[in-house]
């Protein structure tokens, strides 16, 4: 028969032996850089959706969320992606780019 003390200590050991990469409470600091070179730092959970970071950036910079794009390693970030899914590490850089409108035919 296993005592409750043994169960608790076994549970404690399994939590301690987890690797930091799989911890749901781990956070990473990410840098968001705009086209003018201005940088902002954001701390976010590795398993939190990046929409939180993107919305916070747009609110801080007074930008319309639908008019900007966020790019990491040459690919657009989707709102429901997480830093863990994109293998982001401390101080990684996300580029914010303004979406260009237009593209219609030229009429003089």
Swiss-Prot record:
Listed Pfam families: Rad60-SLD
Q: Where is the composition biased (Polar residues)?
A: 1-14
Q: What superkingdom heads the lineage? A: Eukaryota
Q: Which coarse location class describes where this protein primarily resides?
A: nucleus
Q: How does it assemble?
A: Interacts with SAE2, SCE1, SIZ1 and MMS21 Covalently attached to a number of proteins.
Q: Which family does it belong to?
A: Belongs to the ubiquitin family. SUMO subfamily.
**Which GO molecular function entries does the Swiss-Prot or TrEMBL record give?**
protein tag activity
InterPro entries, per this entry?
Answer: Rad60/SUMO-like_dom, Ubiquitin-like_dom, Ubiquitin-like_domsf
Is ATP-binding among this UniProt entry's keywords?
no
Query: Cellular component per GO?
Result: cytoplasm; nucleus
* Stored Gene3D superfamilies: Phosphatidylinositol 3-kinase Catalytic Subunit, Chain A, domain 1 (3.10.20.90)
| Chain positions of cross-link Glycyl lysine isopeptide (Gly-Lys) (interchain with K-? in acceptor proteins) | 103
Q: Where in the cell is it found?
A: Nucleus; Cytoplasm
Q: Which gene encodes it?
A: SUMO5
Organism, per UniProt?
A: Arabidopsis thaliana
One further remark on this entry is:
Stress conditions rapidly and substantially elevates the amount of SUMO1 and SUMO2 conjugates with a concomitant reduction in the amount of free SUMO proteins. The SUMO conjugation system plays an important function in stress protection and/or repair.
Protein name as catalogued: Small ubiquitin-related modifier 5
Q: What does this protein do?
A: Ubiquitin-like protein which can be covalently attached to target lysines as a monomer. Does not seem to be involved in protein degradation and may function as an antagonist of ubiquitin in the degradation process.
Give every Ubiquitin-like domain span.
Answer: 26-103
Q: Where is this region: Disordered?
A: 1-25
**Which keywords has UniProt assigned to this entry?**
Cytoplasm, Isopeptide bond, Nucleus, Ubl conjugation pathway
Record flagged with keyword Cytoplasm:
yes
* GO BP annotations listed: protein sumoylation
Listed SUPFAM superfamilies: Ubiquitin-like
């Amino acid at each position: 028969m296993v005592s409750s003390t043994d169960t608790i200590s076994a549970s404690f050991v399994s939590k301690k032996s987890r690797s930091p990469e799989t911890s749901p409470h781990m956070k990473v600091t990410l840098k968001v850089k705009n086209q003018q070179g201005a940088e902002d730092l954001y701390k976010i959970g590795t398993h939190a959706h990046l929409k939180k970071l993107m919305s916070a950036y747009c609110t801080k910079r007074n930008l319309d969320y639908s008019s900007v794009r966020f790019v990491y390693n040459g690919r657009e970030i989707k709102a429901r992606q997480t830093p863990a899914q994109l293998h982001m590490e401390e101080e990684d850089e996300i580029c914010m780019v303004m979406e260009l409108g237009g593209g219609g035919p030229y009429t003089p």
